[in-house]
Amino acid sequence: STEDGRWLFVGGVSAGKGAPLPVLSSDPIYAGVQDITSIAVARISALPEIQTVVLVAATRGLFRLKNNYSIEELPSSTNYSAALEGLSNVVNKFVGAGKKVVLVVDNPSFRDPKLCVKRKTIFDPLNSYIESQNRSDCSISIDRHMQLSQQYRKLLDEVQRLNPEMVSIFETVRHLCDVQSGLCLTHKNEKLLYSYSDHISDYAAEVIGEDLNEFLSTF
């Protein structure tokens, strides 16, 4: 929160109902989250003091991918139309209630970040093996990430295009990747960017949040 406005967080996991996903759809792939999402959307829409809604949703959730450490299967996903309809329905509800909407771009996905922390033993051959394993699983080039996430980014662009004055996209790559080297890693400035699976760390959230607050002040 800032002097100009306060945040209201809606998320987490409800016992037996999962977490809200910004998708309103009759498609069976989203059946498990419809009740809790419908309640969240209705309550937020009814609160006049909420002027801007920031939507954060994992790519794997929108496209119903099978794992939380990679989006390699995204380019072949056939769920684009369902995701577009479902996300558009949520955004249209908020826009219809007079609220602006910001779509936060999802972060790169990695395996458990704890496995990417450098480890040293007294055996040099073992150290070399550990480092080789880390290098292969703990980084992805920005180009490759963009290539894999193309369908997801197309989805956000299309939703924003339908309501360009009320919907904006907030990019996170500059905070989670090294633009100069062209790499996305699990750490930056000697601090971890992820806490577990594809969830960003408190440090990353603070860095992104500061820039997001600045972005919201001009939107």
Residue ranges and their predicted role:
Residues 1-219:
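Extracellular glycan-modifying ectodomains
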